[in-house]
Curated annotation (Swiss-Prot):
The lineage of its organism: Eukaryota, Metazoa, Chordata, Craniata, Vertebrata. Residues 1-25, 58-78 are annotated as: Disordered. Belongs to the SNAPC3/SRD2 family. It comes from Mus musculus (Mouse). GO terms for molecular function: DNA binding. Its main location: nucleus. This is snRNA-activating protein complex subunit 3. Transmembrane segments: none annotated. Part of the SNAPc complex required for the transcription of both RNA polymerase II and III small-nuclear RNA genes. Binds to the proximal sequence element (PSE), a non-TATA-box basal promoter element common to these 2 types of genes. Recruits TBP and BRF2 to the U6 snRNA TATA box. Residues 1-12 have a biased composition (Gly residues).
């Protein structure tokens, strides 16, 4: 039976869609929210059995040949069709064919710079663009919105169509690709309703541990200890080296990372809590993360799952899409999981110079106007130590890892 869940939109409660007879295909359980449970590997097999070799091929499609004779008659038919669709005259359709024809699609010469706008251009769009660029240059305007758009575009398109140098790293035809959204840790209330922190593409044949290793979280880089008496002492470990335990939760199963001897079963406390109080969640199962691929999973598209690491750093994980690989995708399997989107984070600046990113945070600091207070490395040492490196005053100092460093 489908759960009696309530929709989050203005249309009121969502009603479950009647179930079909199989679970190998993603069908909606609640409209516009999430699908029913289906098996990822069976979904891929179903489509590979339906599609032909040409549909699954990853080779570039051949360009259609241009007709060598009868071109005039074909142009006449095309002009008539365009005139009918656009509601214009045959003369206007013929002019459009001449101006917008394929022979007009030419590349720039080797000595021409595409970034330079010519002075004698007649295009209004280029004139407007040139005026904006000249205005920014004169007024030293920083277009942060444009910078973020460029960052997002480059992140999404940097690997499109990329092929591996080693043919052995080529993705197989018919491989499944899943889109995975990684949200901010639950403890960050200000990002509770925000867009995903990271969006990744993973292959169906990849193990869960490969996604686990590719997720970047600032809590993995934290450095434990207080360093006010020895700021030059290099930290021995970061949190990711000390606390290697983690798990994914998908459809009643906790997939624990047990690759290292020091890994613990973080799900045991949750399972014991559920069973001892008869919470009504049913019987949970556990498995080793390194033994399962995404093709082995039963999932719902659009349903919130869980990734937990560092003991209590919890990220909501949503699988938003599943499809077969296309020849325009990145075909180098060594680049997967492939990061395609990332939220831009503002860095925390030093309280003193307001220029550089904070590297230290202090508590109970007699030299600071607030508690806690953030400093870059230069300002921290100039304010808290003498020329010989001796500590001045009383304070507690901790290394600070700014989330903006992931930009």
């Amino acid at each position: 039976m489908a759960e009696d869940l309530q929709g989050g939109g203005a249309g009121g409660p969502q009603h479950p869609v009647p179930s079909a007879s199989h679970s190998s295909f993603p069908e909606y359980e609640l409209p516009e929210l999430h699908t029913r449970v289906f098996h990822v590997g069976s979904f891929g097999e179903l489509w590979r059995g339906r599609l032909g070799a040409q549909d699954l091929s990853l080779s570039e499609p051949q360009a259609a040949e241009q007709p060598t004779d009868g071109g005039a008659s074909n142009d006449g038919f095309e002009d008539a069709a365009v005139a009918s669709d656009l509601g214009c005259s045959l003369e206007a359709a013929a002019e459009l064919r001449v101006v917008c024809g394929l022979d007009k699609l030419r590349c720039l010469g080797e000595d021409e710079d595409p970034e330079v706008i010519p002075e004698n251009t007649d295009l209004v769009t280029l004139c407007v663009r040139k005026g904006l660029l000249d205005y920014r240059e004169e007024n030293i305007t920083i277009d942060r919105a444009c910078r973020q758009e460029i960052f997002a575009y480059e992140m999404e398109s940097h690997a499109l169509g990329k092929k591996p140098e080693n043919p052995a790293d080529m993705i197989e035809e018919g491989e499944c690709i899943l889109s995975v959204n990684i949200l901010y840790p639950v403890i960050f209330n200000k990002h509770k309703e925000h867009k995903p922190y990271q969006t990744m593409l993973v292959l169906g044949s990849q193990k869960l541990t490969e996604l686990r290793d590719s997720i970047c979280c600032v809590s993995d880089l934290q450095i434990g200890g207080e360093f006010s008496n020895a700021p030059d002492q290099a930290p021995e470990h970061i949190s990711k080296d000390l606390y290697k335990s983690a798990f994914f939760y998908f459809e009643g199963t906790f997939y624990n990372d047990r690759r290292y001897p020091e890994c613990r079963d973080l799900s045991r406390t949750i399972i014991e809590w559920s069973e001892s109080h008869d919470r009504g969640y049913g019987k949970f199962q556990t498995a080793r993360m390194e033994d399962f691929t995404f093709n082995d999973l039963h999932i719902k598209l659009g349903f919130p799952y869980l990734y937990c690491h560092q003991g209590d750093c919890e990220h909501v994980v949503v699988i938003t899409d599943i499809r077969l690989v296309h020849h325009d995708d990145c075909l180098d399997r060594t680049l997967y999981p492939l990061l395609t989107k990332k939220h831009w984070l503002w860095t925390r600046k030093c309280f003193v110079c307001k220029m550089y990113t904070a590297r230290w945070v202090t508590n109970n600091d007699t030299f600071a106007p607030e508690d806690p207070c953030f400093f870059c490395d230069v300002c921290f040492r100039m304010l808290h130590y003498d020329s010989e490196g001796n500590k001045l005053g009383e304070f507690l100092a901790y290394p600070y890892v700014d989330p903006g460093t992931f930009n």
